[in-house]
């Protein structure tokens, strides 16, 4: 299995049960054909008659057999044994399958609010960035959290919109989180301290977003239920 955004090398996943020594395959060519779920040929491994090893040929030569599926994918490997002398025996083929399971990462954002007079119903806005790309915008009330799922591996930055929450001082308005196969579930914790005089309008009246302690599925962009 791999994580979304990572890759796998098909050459390392296709294994032959037979051992060829050049004698036991002196009169047959053996070919392993790898196809994707749509039936398209991804690559072939051919052991010529009389040889103890073969060579790979990939449909995308530059890939070298490396694939990065965005969802769980099953591949079919067809082993075909073809006699080099015609009219003696017919070719024989047998199929086998293997699956590359694609897992996804998650990112939990939590907001804590401190200070005298802090209003737990105030809302705070966070932009989740991957490089220069906006992944999603999250709205949280104080002392709440939300989890974004369906994320690929990579470096993310959670940035608070301090122009919106101008009456609160964040400990750090930006948190960097690296998601990987080793660390697939990241977390960004941001604490805000209420200033002496604070005022904050509900962002729900301005943009059609959500406030919830809920899961947000990045793959579907479905807002939370709005329940705590």
Task: Mark where each language-model region is.
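Solvent-exposed loop/turn and edge beta-strand elements of beta-rich ligand-binding domains
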Residues: 1-228
